Amino acid sequence: TNLDFIIGPLYPEQIAPLSKFCQQHHIKLVVPFSSLGDNVYENPYYYAINPPKSYQFAEASRLTTELFGKDNVIFLEGTENDKDAAAFIDATRKRLQQNGSKANRLKLNDDEIKWMETMTQYKDNVIIPNSSGIKLLNQLFPKLKEFTKKNPEYRIKLVGYPEWQTYASNHLENFYQFNTYANSTYYKNPLNVKDEEIDKANQNAI
């Protein structure tokens, strides 16, 4: 075969045989429509635009541990339940334990004394919320601003989720202020005019 790559297939049941074919013939396979199956683990020619969430969580937790494993990692519990966030936090917690590190836990509504006990002046405090929702951020940022105003010597970073990119119109300055990181398989630049043009075109097409 003289193919360089194949885009597809459309149906999930076609993925396994096509993946096998591409691996045998050294053809790159780009799968844009489905994240089902574990071919991404087994086939080096397999590129999943929407990879399995288990793979995303594993990679995100690995990068998080590499970047912040020596910092004061804090898992922040809000009032919402988020299965994806919980899976990411669990994977990160296990990786930290494997590396001999330990994360702290803090509740959003804990009092100031508890926040002071959990934070440290001697390391970066890396806060990972248990929700990707904007509701938690709306509650968290005022609390962080109040805390850092009273305690400017504390360094705080946030680690979050792909959805946070869509909150840039509300929280871009807050993201900058608290040195925010978000794991994601895509990136949307809120300051790029071309991104705005694409958004408008999509809205007009609906």
Model-derived segments and their meaning:
Residues 17-21, 63, 87-91, 115-118, ...:
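A short acidic, amphipathic alpha-helical/loop segment
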Residues 25, 99, 151-154:
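Helix C-cap/helix->beta junction micro-motif
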Residues 75-77, 83-87, 91-106, 164, ...:
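Cysteine-dependent hydrolase recognition
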Residues 141-206:
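Extracellular/periplasmic periplasmic-binding protein-like sensory domains
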